[in-house]
Amino acid sequence: MSKQQVEIFMPPNKLKQKVGEGGGLDLNAVKRAEAAIEDLRDEFSDWITADVENLATAHEAYKTDPNMDNLGTLYRCAHDLKGQATTFEFPLVARVASSLCKMTDEGGDGGKSAPASLLSAHVDAIKVILRQKIMDPSDKMATVLASELERQVTVFLQKTAAR
């Protein structure tokens, strides 16, 4: 077999010229963002309290009139908490709210058959976690409660899927 000569052509890399030398993150911008978050920290308590009150109001409306609109409002309130509670330094509220979202969103009937007692248990757990100011994600009692709620939701969803 004869050897064939190969020429390798390396085109010039002009990406660096186009992008520039940039040093990555602007540490001053990061410090300003951290300072802004710290300034808002005092307001976090008010915001999460308002969000939990909205959840409780939506839950009461659903208990009074269990229709899909009220269930949708309950879901949206739980979804807001799921997304914001960790920022507000209440990761267990986020965890329980996530479980509530799962129950009201993933059921085959859109959550209509979710047991009222399980809905109430989620809302009550969120209110207690906030009232007791449980911010530690490893709090023994709250993690046991969150785990049990998640387990009950899994059981509910399995039953719903089997129908």
Question: What label would you give each PLM region?
Answer:
Residues 31-36, 44-46, 58, 110-141:
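A contiguous, mid-protein "functional segment" used to position or interact
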Residues 2-19, 122-161:
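Structural secondary-structure packing elements that flank or coincide with functional cores
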Residues 46-49, 53, 72, 79, ...:
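Generic structural signal for well-ordered, non-transmembrane alpha-helical segments
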Residues 55-66, 85, 104-111, 133:
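Secondary-structure edge/capping motif, primarily at the C-terminal ends of alpha-helices
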Residues 68-107:
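Extended, amphipathic alpha-helices with heptad-repeat/coiled-coil or helix-bundle character
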Residues 29-72:
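Long, amphipathic alpha-helical coiled-coil segments characteristic
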Residues 68, 72-76, 98, 113-120, ...:
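Short, charged, amphipathic alpha-helical segments
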Residues 1-43:
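N-terminal leader/targeting peptides and immediately adjacent processing regions
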